[in-house]
Amino acid sequence: MPRTATTSAPPTLLTWGPRELPVPYVARWSGESVSTAGLVVKPDGSGLAYEDEVAADRDGHGVLWARMGEAVGVGRPDYRAMSSHRQRVAALCKLCQVCGGPADRTAKGWLFLMPAAPPGEEGCAEPEPIEGTLTTKPPICHPCAELAVRHCPHLAAPLYVRSRKPRVWGVFGGFVTPSPTGALVNSADTYMPYGDREAAPWFLASQLALELTRCT
């Protein structure tokens, strides 16, 4: 079972396993399962809905979200996946994705941490444009950024980005549409901007997408 770290890690950070590996606030646990039970096409054929849908199933833009249980600490942490609820809260409230506390902010903006671009054809890293980058990763605080770099293999060459205005751009998830037989078919995961009235009725969101603007 996870427990609160007592070293230099933030006080709210959970650890897991005999090596006491830090578990990010947004990380999904194996006890948190996604359920599509009750997902149907609306009677008028205009899009997706839940048979027992409640207001909390849609966000302020009317986009339907995948249902995921909240069970922090139950099972094993999946470092590759994020809890839909905690990711969304952290992205909206500018919370650190690792400890869940306030993310780091200076006059240059909020701190984001991401892997550097892969090497180019000649073996040299080709800089990617940062301005306008879409990300589902919430911001991070400075101590947790250092912690993440020490523990995450994909951050061997980290890129620290400051965004003065990380704008809520849309959502990440997938389209779910009926097949000729009436069965619902899932598409590959993709981004969808808010305001796409044609696509939104058939989209099932799992994460909030931020656009990093005014970056340094």
Please report, for each region that a protein language model flagged, where it lies by residue.
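N-terminal alpha-helical interaction blocks
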Residues: 1-91, 163-216
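Long acidic/polar interaction regions in large eukaryotic complex-forming proteins
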Residues: 78-84, 91-95, 115-118, 123
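Short metal-coordination and nucleic-acid-contact micro-motifs, chiefly zinc-binding Cys/His arrays
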Residues: 89-95, 134-137
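Short cysteine-rich clusters marking metal-coordination/redox-active sites
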Residues: 96-100, 141
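Beta-hairpin (beta-strand-turn-beta-strand) motif
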Residues: 101-102, 116
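Short, non-ligating residues that shape and space the ligands of small metal-coordination modules
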Residues: 103-109, 150-151
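Conserved binding-pocket/active-site segment within a compact domain
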Residues: 112-204
